[in-house]
Amino acid sequence: MKKSDRELGMDREINRRDFLNGASIAIAGAVLSSGALAASTASMTPSSPPIDEPVPTGGTGRYLYVATPGIIDYLGYGGHGLLVFDIDDDHKFVKRIPTRGFHADGTPSNVKGIDVSVPLNSVYISTLEGMQRIDLSTEEVVWEIAFEGGCDRMSISPDGMTMYLPSLEKEFWNVVNTETGDIIAKIDVDTSAHNTIYGPSGTRAYMADYKSPWLFVADTNTHKIVQKIGHFGAPVRPFTMKSDESIVYVNVDRLLGFEVGDLRTGEKLARVRVQGWDNGPVQRHGNPSHGIALTPDEREIWVCDGVNMRMHVFSAEAPYQQLTTIALRDMPGWVTFTIDGQYAYASSGEVIHAKTRKILYLLQDEHYNTVCSEKMVEIFLQDGKATKAGDQFGLGRLPVAGD
């Protein structure tokens, strides 16, 4: 079936000559400013390297790595590749690293997840069919493996050596050696493996089956299921948690909002609805709220609203007060933060100042097209070597006693 103009990306390509002459773009970031709502507008002049100028590998700095196509397989949201943006230089586009990951017909496959192993200096990209490991210094693909049952959104252990890799909505997860890609173990869960978070402690992995109202917990020493959290009000979609692995916040089917669970007792604690905005149909994911993140200081929960193209901000503590709402340019399906909590990244392309709620920039590629993706991660480099990395999930990052 032919894709609609909206699916392919409705933004018109901005003429490069206009930018070279110094024209600027105004970003529509208007947000209502009454009660629990705040205003947010911004403008920017994109700054990108000449399209034909080669960019060297390696580098030193703090970068945002964005894997595309990161919204289904829509190439209108940034094309195909691993796009690099300089966070400390106004999120300027740096380069596009060629990637693999193709359907059998040769067209780019949907990117399903992205993660980093700092010790192996590698970034990993999962697609519908397989997984590729890319060396951050050489920017070459080290290996690409097609996994039986396909792949979904994975998560790597804190020591960088083990990956929990869900099959593509099948009944199992693979436990994978990140250096070789070899399968260490297989964990049968339910029917539709989907999202994964390897706990910050390294002792537990949390697995969401998108047709189950339970969040499954595995012991990472035995690779066996040891606990179920919930059950929640409907099947679990994206989720996030506090750094001490005490509280989990989850999106669930049909809810514009989120639910809260206790990771220690296994109980569901609360159901929180977005107030003042209508629920209804969405373009993607079949769910009004697909995307949730905890600010690194663990004070706020940011929740995507695909119905109204908004980001809603809540207090992370009961009674979970609704604080404000930010208007976005397209449907958000994901949100994450920089490690320091300065910036929030919506999958609709906005770079948001987390404290002021202002939209500062739109991510744009070498052709000045807006880049949208649900698969992005912050990486710190020193001479081409990773020294620290964020996460595709917006996780709590408060220090834990004993760490």
Q: What residue spans do the PLM features occupy?
A:
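N-terminal secretory signal peptides
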Residues: 1-18, 25-32, 41
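Short, flexible coil/linker elements and helix-boundary hinge sites characteristic
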Residues: 9, 35, 106-108
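Predominantly soluble domains enriched in secretory-pathway, periplasmic, or organellar proteins
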Residues: 14, 43-403
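Generic short alpha-helical hydrophobic face used as a protein-protein interaction/packing hotspot
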Residues: 23-24, 86
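Signal peptide processing junction and immediate N-terminal pro/mature segment
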Residues: 36-44
